[in-house]
Amino acid sequence: MSDVVPVRNALISVSDKMGLADFAAGLSAAGVTIYSTGGTRAHLEQSGIKVEDVAEYTGFPEMLDGRVKTLHPRIFAGILARRDLDDHMDTIADHDIEPFDLVVVNLYPFAATVSRSGATRAECIEQIDIGGPSLVRAAAKNHGDVAIATSPEQYGDVLDQLETLGGTTDELRTQLAAEAFDHTAGYDRAIADYMQGDAVGGEFPASMHVSLRRKTQLRYGENPHQRAALYSDSSDRSANLVSARQISGKELSYNNLLDLDAALDIARGFAEPAVSVIKHNNPCGAATGDTLSEAVDKAMAGDPLSAFGSVIGMNRTLDEATAEFLCQPGLFIEAIVAPDFEAGAVGLLTTKPRWKDNVRLMQVGRLDEPARKVSRRFISGGMLVQDADRMVSSPLQWNTVTETPVDDDLWDDISFGWEMVRHVKSNAIVLAKDTSLIGVGAGQMSRVDSVEISIKKAAERSEGSILASDAFFPFPDSIEAAAKAGVLAIIQPGGSRRDDEVIAACDEHEIAMVFTGRRHFKH
């Protein structure tokens, strides 16, 4: 192929050394001379690979604690010289400069350092790479002659072409250059976001860049006629679905991912064993228990009909006892997300006659790291950004506003209901009993309609339950409906012009009411 450029000299300077020794060994076997610096050179030499020292080649030592290594004309001229221009080639020959045909660079882990708990400003600043981005941009600019690899994932493609073609093609070099510029753009954006956030004292930055990398193409979107793909956000260090390990099951769909994310978000909000059951991005069941199997039993009983074909989230390792419960006749589950799965549980879930290996099992790892701190949502012409709606209030900050007191036995259910209602589409109403969800009214334009739907779902179980509302009650009509259903206590933000009427209606029916002072709309 006429566009194949042979690789005779390679410059390697990387922070992430995953797969590097094997890659460099392949380059050496292909007759490539390798130049390298500092820790990268030491790593390669320890792996038995011959390496030329950049400091010896440039005649200038590394200095300033490694801040200056490759910033030298002998390096950059060798990268930027155009092979099709005689004066370029004559110039580097006059100065005894070797042309580099391959540059392998990945950058200091700035984003990882910034997201690490306890990282100091000095540590973050020290992870701002200078020479690396310069090398990457130089090689990417001259991609007509130079291949630039910025990720271990690219090593295989480069070696394949060296082995089969003796060099790199224009198509590969162009692709690598595009990925390189995307890499440095995201890197600089992360630094700017950090510096802007620091400068304005925690306000949202004046500009924001969303840097995402496509992980996989999905079969389709919410509907078969819509194209879809999944992109990863390297700045999200919490346990998440994009970096999760799929243990078994069919390919995840767009809707599966949305529902699994909602299921995980609910489960991680509880300290005790918790299970959430999601259908169309709303919970149709949820519960806590002394054990995971108790929690899943209670959660699935919340709305058994809707739970068919649902996805489930858990905040504990899925054990065999829980798996045995899920394998009972009549249950069908699309997917399960959990920190981990016992081997016996996987065996049960993947050999159930009706399921076989179709159920998708997603292992996300420990839930120690908090979930994302901000939420982002695209609208026409821009993006909305807000703090994530995390629960920071506690019963100590709440206020019982009725003369009717809250029975001590109801506080666990009240706290559970208040945690759950923020996960339901507004107008949102939930009924809870025995720390389990027994009725959900979601997404209605009228609050009283949501109340009536939740009561209908709970049926006779509503007797002795508590009701949680994501926003205030504009009229007492919802209280009348709750009283007929046997609700004993209601928790809501308060703030209506008719709060007095609502409170009076509660006292009339001997229902306790708690104000939290915090609304939890979800649109």
Curated annotation (Swiss-Prot):
GO terms for biological process: 'de novo' IMP biosynthetic process. This is Bifunctional purine biosynthesis protein PurH. Residues 1-150 form the MGS-like domain. Pathway: Purine metabolism; IMP biosynthesis via de novo pathway; 5-formamido-1-(5-phospho-D-ribosyl)imidazole-4-carboxamide from 5-amino-1-(5-phospho-D-ribosyl)imidazole-4-carboxamide (10-formyl THF route): step 1/1; Purine metabolism; IMP biosynthesis via de novo pathway; IMP from 5-formamido-1-(5-phospho-D-ribosyl)imidazole-4-carboxamide: step 1/1. Keywords: Hydrolase, Multifunctional enzyme, Purine biosynthesis, Transferase. NCBIfam families: PRK00881.1, purH. Pfam families: AICARFT_IMPCHas (PF01808), MGS (PF02142). Disulfide bonds: none annotated. One of its GO terms (cellular component) is cytosol. The lineage of its organism: Bacteria, Pseudomonadati, Planctomycetota, Planctomycetia, Pirellulales. Belongs to the PurH family. Its EC number is 2.1.2.3, 3.5.4.10.
